[in-house]
């Protein structure tokens, strides 16, 4: 199995903390369908704030398995056009893609990404073809579960390192432990474990030494009572608590509901509630 790229080193714990919490959008709707010739269409709609505007986007994706080439194009009601072409069979271990954006405000960019991965080494580079100011590259090395990597953005115009990040850790089948830091003096320690087939737990400690001497600690858990539902809970030492419930109503429809509140200040008007409905016929 190929080694993870730098951005995926903390994939397990980050997915547990960020995925399937529905309180951020009061309303979210996803509809996905696939035609007989293999073209996938996806419609997404979400309401960022209560009584606010609804943001929508439609995306079409075609994938040629034989050649390893896919073409995706999406358009939103904010007139943002996104086109992505992916090449997954350039050579063994090599992948590449071109991702282009266009908006009415004349914001245009076209990023070219190239990656290579094998069992103990993974690397990825990215550059904006239209505005080649920054060159972004990452390297990851691994051996017997131990992994380490760095990510660097180099400003070619100024001739200096714009940002950097580093991570080291240990990845196993049932658990992982990661230490990370970056040039913004932010240090993070995270732990993830598959306790059993029903329960996952994770914790994260973050220190922003540039702005505060206090360490922020968060805990998260995911419980899967059966094959069609799950319950998640997340709490921070600040008292911010987030709960969510997701259930597959049938093989094509899933419903998710979530809420967040401050357990230390229940009288404060900071509560949020949201729900999500997904159709995949």
UniProtKB/Swiss-Prot annotation:
UniProt entry keywords in alphabetical sequence: ATP-binding, Ion transport, Lipid transport, Membrane, Mitochondrion, Mitochondrion outer membrane, Nucleotide-binding, Porin, Transmembrane, Transmembrane beta strand, Transport
One annotated GO biological process: cell redox homeostasis
Binding site for ATP: 11, 19
CC per GO annotation: mitochondrial outer membrane; mitochondrion; pore complex
One Pfam family it belongs to: Porin_3
Keyword Transmembrane attached: yes
Subcellular location: Mitochondrion outer membrane
Gene Ontology MF terms in the entry: ATP binding; porin activity; voltage-gated monoatomic anion channel activity
Keyword Coiled coil: no
Family annotation (InterPro entries): Porin_dom_sf (IPR023614), Porin_Euk (IPR001925), Porin_Euk/Tom40 (IPR027246)
Function: Non-selective voltage-gated ion channel that mediates the transport of anions and cations through the mitochondrion outer membrane. The channel adopts an open conformation at low or zero membrane potential and a closed conformation at potentials above 30-40 mV. The open state has a weak anion selectivity whereas the closed state is cation-selective. Does not confer permeability to NADH. Catalyzes the scrambling of phospholipids across the outer mitochondrial membrane; the mechanism is unrelated to channel activity and is capable of translocating both anionic and zwitterionic phospholipids.
Annotated family: Belongs to the eukaryotic mitochondrial porin family.
Record's protein name: Non-selective voltage-gated ion channel 2
Source organism of this protein record: Saccharomyces cerevisiae (strain ATCC 204508 / S288c)
